[in-house]
């Protein structure tokens, strides 16, 4: 099993200067390769203390210069906020600088504050994502970009530096809609799962995706990658206490950043699932129930419990990759460092021994 590390640069409540958060998170990131992680990841967000990584490719380029062999992943780059030609150039340049170590993760975004900041209408996100992804992925395969869509208009231009190698087999999408699934499948794009839904819902979505992938390509879809907020300790009681404190605090920051406690997403095309959270959060006891549900989806406990929970995630999704988030929710840096190091020592070697699970070759939904 592929095992990665993700750093997310949170500064909840701005309790310290942002530059200190960067210094601390980079201490973690620079240990990823020596500790044996297969990849290092970060996620694009803007304008709040939720996640302060406005240019994930810039961070990964920095990490390319600090490392020799570890893969460099975006979890994710939010395509509707960008000119797709600039994204293609940044990805191609990162891949050349890193000798082909880039793993491209793409998404469409959910934060209203970010869409408004970039002057993009949220109801257009699904269409913009599909068009941008198609132009981007075709460009990275062909070495030139050209597109004539509803949202993306691009006369033919060459990508220089030319792409290092094909991105097929190392591209993932965190948002697959009915409209974009066929485009993604034809491009050979895998699924990147950030746990937030009940596993039966995730399984249903994956079944639909695998069916679409097979119909479009005649091939079996690649195994997904899963992220997870992780806390490990030799004491099961302490692990649970810290998980509920810090993963719970992270979930609070999710609610604040995405404004799930407001009803705007209920009437925004393409965000119906997210809009349902408003009703669940505002039901009697809803906030605590949602917090407990989210925390219980994540990966925490003793080394054996952490291993078992990754196994459960793997069995529910048939994933062949796990990216651990070890620092979040205001967790002290020393605790985050210990958390990461113990996971790398006590659990990661056993995860790497796991062989891929076989997905059913599904031809119909």
Walk through the language-model features, giving the residues of each:
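Internal, glycine-rich beta/alpha segment that forms the wall or movable "lid"
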Residues: 83-190, 199-220, 362
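An alpha-helical appendage that flanks or caps ligand/catalytic pockets
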Residues: 126-159, 200-319, 352-365
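N-terminal beta1-alpha1-beta2 module of alpha/beta enzyme domains
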Residues: 1-72, 167-169, 361-365
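Active-site mouth loops of central-metabolism enzymes
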Residues: 7-22, 77-84, 165-175, 231, ...
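Short, acidic/polar
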Residues: 19-31, 90, 175-182, 305-312
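Conserved, mostly hydrophobic/aromatic
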Residues: 36, 44, 63, 94, ...
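Structural motif
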Residues: 35, 97, 187, 316-317
């Amino acid at each position: 099993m592929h095992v990665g590390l993700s750093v997310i640069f949170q500064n909840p409540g701005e309790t310290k200067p942002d530059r200190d958060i960067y210094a601390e998170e980079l201490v973690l990131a620079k240990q990823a390769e020596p500790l044996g992680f297969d990849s290092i990841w970060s996620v694009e967000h803007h304008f709040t203390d939720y996640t302060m990584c406005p240019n994930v490719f810039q961070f990964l380029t920095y990490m390319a210069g600090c490392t020799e062999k570890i893969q460099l992943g975006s979890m994710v780059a939010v395509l509707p906020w960008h000119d797709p030609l600039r994204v293609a150039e940044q990805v191609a340049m990162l891949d050349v600088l890193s000798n082909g170590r880039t793993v491209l993760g793409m998404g469409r975004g959910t934060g209203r504050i970010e869409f408004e900041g970039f002057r993009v209408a949220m109801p257009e996100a699904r269409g913009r994502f599909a068009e941008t992804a198609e132009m981007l992925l075709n460009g990275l395969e062909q070495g030139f970009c050209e597109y004539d869509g509803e949202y993306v208009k691009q006369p033919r231009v060459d990508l220089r530096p030319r792409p290092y190698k094909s991105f097929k087999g190392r591209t993932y999408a965190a948002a697959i809609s009915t409209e974009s699934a066929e485009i993604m499948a034809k491009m050979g794009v895998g699924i990147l799962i950030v746990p937030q839904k009940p596993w039966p819902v995730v399984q249903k979505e994956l079944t639909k995706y695998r069916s679409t992938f097979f119909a479009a390509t005649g091939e079996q879809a690649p195994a997904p990658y899963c992220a997870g907020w992780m806390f490990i300790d030799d004491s099961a009681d302490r692990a649970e206490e810290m998980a509920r404190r810090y993963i719970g605090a992270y979930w609070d920051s999710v609610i604040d950043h995405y404004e799930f406690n407001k009803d705007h997403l209920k009437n925004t095309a393409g965000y119906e699932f997210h809009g349902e959270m408003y009703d669940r959060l505002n039901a009697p006891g809803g906030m605590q129930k949602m917090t407990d549900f989210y925390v219980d989806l994540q990966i925490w406990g003793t080394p054996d419990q952490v291993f078992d929970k990754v196994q459960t995630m793997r069995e529910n999704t048939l994933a062949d990759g796990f990216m651990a988030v070890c620092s979040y929710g205001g967790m002290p840096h020393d605790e985050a460092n210990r958390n990461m190091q113990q996971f790398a020592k006590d659990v990661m070697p056993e995860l790497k021994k796991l062989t891929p699970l076989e997905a059913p070759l599904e031809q119909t939904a």
